[in-house]
């Protein structure tokens, strides 16, 4: 894979070994604008790599250094995610630059092919677990939406990157106590059980038994990745079964 070197001044030393991969979209008008921003010392943002629509890859920060891409976030108990992760920015306007009809711009095949090839190389070098291949919205659900519900997570999983619940429909439905569904304002044991499952997957959520805005944000982030046609932030039975299946898959991997 040909990689163009575009050194960014925005990095420092890691405080932990690499065991995580974080995927982002750039969310800007053009890839050039995103690249220039990550090369600007005053912007204080960067990523290790950026992948253009045609599959071109630029490296901005060496993998042994701490790029500044994750910001404030949490996954599986870790909070200094810049220290333990490699970050890839994928050129795509996303929610910030939608198409004329309001839809999200697609990720071209050549770009996704490059994402898969580069990601495989990274996880091979660092022995990154499948459960630690995440999107920006996974680690910061209350403030980030990328790489978006239009990102082909299932395609990546089929290529060996990340987990996909193949038996979600068959997951136990014994949480019938969910009733008609859970949403903001609901409280009690069913909510706490839901929060515990989301926390075990990795979301930075403290089980409280209260379905608050933080819980809603985590459910929505989950749906952006594993139930992309259903972006409600509500937990109906389909969402619950998918959450249970993903949690089981993560537990089996561990």
Regions from the language model: what does each represent?
Residues 59, 71-73, 77, 105-134, ...:
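Cell-envelope/ECM-targeting effectors and their regulatory/trafficking segments
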Residues 94, 139-140:
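Short Gly/Pro-enriched loop/turn and capping motifs at secondary-structure junctions
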């Amino acid at each position: 894979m040909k990689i163009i070197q575009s050194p960014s001044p925005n990095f420092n030393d890691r405080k932990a070994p690499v065991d995580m991969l974080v995927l982002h979209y750039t969310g800007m008008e053009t890839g050039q604008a995103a690249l220039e921003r990550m090369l600007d010392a005053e912007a204080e943002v960067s990523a290790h790599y950026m992948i253009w629509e045609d599959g071109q890859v630029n490296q901005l920060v060496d993998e042994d250094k701490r790029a500044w891409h994750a910001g404030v976030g949490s996954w599986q108990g870790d909070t200094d995610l810049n220290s333990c992760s490699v970050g890839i920015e994928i050129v795509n306007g996303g929610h910030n630059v939608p198409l004329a009809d309001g839809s999200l711009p697609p990720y071209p095949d050549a770009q996704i092919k490059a994402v898969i090839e580069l990601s495989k190389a990274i996880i091979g070098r660092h022995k990154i677990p499948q459960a630690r291949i995440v999107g920006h919205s996974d680690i910061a659900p209350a403030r980030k939406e990328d790489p978006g519900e239009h990102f082909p997570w299932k395609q990546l999983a089929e290529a060996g990157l990340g987990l996909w619940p193949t038996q979600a429909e068959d997951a136990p439905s014994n949480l019938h106590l969910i009733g008609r569904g859970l949403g903001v304002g609901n409280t009690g044991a069913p909510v706490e059980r839901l929060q515990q499952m989301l926390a075990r997957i990795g979301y930075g959520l403290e089980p409280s038994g209260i379905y608050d805005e933080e819980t809603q944000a985590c459910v929505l982030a989950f749906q952006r990745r594993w139930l992309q046609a259903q972006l409600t932030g509500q937990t109906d039975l389909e969402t619950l079964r998918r959450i249970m299946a993903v949690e089981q898959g993560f537990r089996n991997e561990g």
